[in-house]
């Protein structure tokens, strides 16, 4: 991204001219300084500069194929674009203060390298409307693959922690209240599952991103007999847009991108919320690595969970980006409107935030130290084995309604005495229901409770091991997709 100062309207030395713009013939002068300040977009759309080079090379080839650019001019233009691409990559070419947007800057850069006679021919048959829609799709397709790879790394960190603690039992909660004992690995893999679905959402989104609007012109297509399919193929798209109006004016691909990126953040935020509680003294489930926590400026004892807190806080930012983009799109008539300039900043920002959050969250998770004894100690607290007592009665032929009532009565007695269910006497059990025999104590252990939940997806160790294998297999497959370049 270029230095924002380079495009500061306050530094304009060409006030009142149209230098750096791709329009102006019917205007007697350029925009006012305030108008330019409102219009300029190089401070955020410069990320599209490498894609402008790729798209321009493809466009030059179809101009040549259509007889609108000679072979010699094509060779000159491609050489100039290659040099421009290198100069963008090494930072030697950046937007000038007079450049309105990335497109104007890149055309200026090309003309500087090949002259106006050749460079001025490139714009034939294309509009900024179809150009930016195509380039934005290209940028997003690469960006979501980078994000997907990082999501798999977080998934792998969760899976590795699950593998390292296969037998650790912890309290399972509903409504933030003690519910049933579960395996820690079961809980960690439960956070991996939505992240896998997030990558699948990116994969599915990519099918809609892979439609090229190039060739749609401003809105109605082109009369120059260009070949949109050829450009689409060269740029890695699956097809060209079926409707030029839709191709230039639709941004549902952007709002869908914003949603999936926000959903990734939301899924990380749920994990972050749990870690924040897990590392408190009251829970004591985990200790954070010094590398992924901070201290207090006044309280020497503090070890603060800044990473999960920032994940939680920045998630609101990604949700805001989605909401803002949807509000921008809601009332736009066909076809292109300048409002659509507002599509890029929220997406670029959401990608940037995830590029910060994902590696930090992965580092945090991979270095968590779990305290298995503490989790095991708390697992039966709150009478989490009450369901096991009821289900034992069901296996003895008691209707669940009666078993549920009996188990609740046992909880009431144990609570009044300040003991666990397993500590109730034979007489106390029988006083609740004569069918509660001493054999019920066989299921009133957290190990037995966990092992008994052996249906697919359950918390029994054998089932959790299967879940981990499936998570790792799917994560590897999705990473394979994400690491495959869009363009060969």
From Swiss-Prot:
It catalyses: 2-(N(omega)-L-arginino)succinate = fumarate + L-arginine. Its EC number is 4.3.2.1. InterPro entries: Arg_succ_lyase_C, Argininosuccinate_lyase, Fumarase/histidase_N, Fumarate_lyase_CS, Fumarate_lyase_fam, Fumarate_lyase_N, L-Aspartase-like. The keyword Cytoplasm applies. The keyword Transport does not apply. Keywords: Amino-acid biosynthesis, Arginine biosynthesis, Cytoplasm, Lyase. Pathway: Amino-acid biosynthesis; L-arginine biosynthesis; L-arginine from L-ornithine and carbamoyl phosphate: step 3/3. One of its GO terms (cellular component) is cytosol. It comes from the Bacteria. Belongs to the lyase 1 family. Argininosuccinate lyase subfamily. This is Argininosuccinate lyase. It comes from Corynebacterium jeikeium (strain K411). The gene is argH.
